[in-house]
Amino acid sequence: MTLRTDAALLIVAHGSTVNPDSSAPTLAHAAEIRRREIFAGVESAFWKEEPSLRDAIFLFDPELIREVCVVPNFISEGYFTQTVVPRELDLNGRVTKRPNGQIWKYSEPVGNHPMMTELLLKRACEVAPGVSPGETSLLIVAHGTDLNENSAVAAKREAEQIRALGKYATVLNVYMEEPPLVSDWRKLTKTRNVVVVPFFISDGLHSYEDIPRLIGISRSHPERSEAKSKDLAVKPLGNFTGSLDSARDDIGLARGEVFRRNPYKIGGRSLFYAPSIGTDAGFADIIVEQALNAKS
């Protein structure tokens, strides 16, 4: 792609004051897009972190940047994409002209892009390599019962599209807080293999703790050698010693270990648990696509 010397990309996301992993995927995708040199500038802004959405209005020099493409790194349309982001960035529609002459174009959220289906299939294959889809149930997990129900609708849409492909024995959209419940996966599925993919932008409390507890793997361990079980990443948190930064790194490793212990053997079946879909490197491609679509 040709470098647009007068155009910039702004990726906006929720962020978190308590979960440092919340902004990590957004920052990683921004770094990758910056490396590709498609835009003259690539920045990120957050609702709950710095730089803030409100400050993002001043990130780009109007003398150098004439057009800013804003891409919401959210899984679906909802309260934040429809209300918070436009309010904080002072946007009055899909296209906003600033008094300084800059044109700001606001795209649909990344979760609306057709490539989401492809990424979900890719992640399901990666987390369960060599496992036959015909003998596997794929569960796409969303929150359910939230400020806006669109995330549940988006999960249902993706499940329907993957189901129509006829690749997996069963494809279900399931939820943490409303039926069909992810905690009922044993009743909902009959296959020997089950793949669970959290339909979230980043990993955090839901993917590290809540969903594992709901599906019964928070205390389960796959068959692995004693040598591996003694690895730092799987030690109880109380065993960590050293500096605060080192402890934080260790805690991050311990949280991420839940994704590396596949498969979980439960009731004679194999359960494979994936990281949140928003951590997939392919999101950078979707962000670029959404930005280019917003510019057209």
Q: Which ranges hold each PLM region?
A:
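Active-site-proximal alpha-helix that buttresses catalytic centers in soluble enzyme cores
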Residues: 1-296
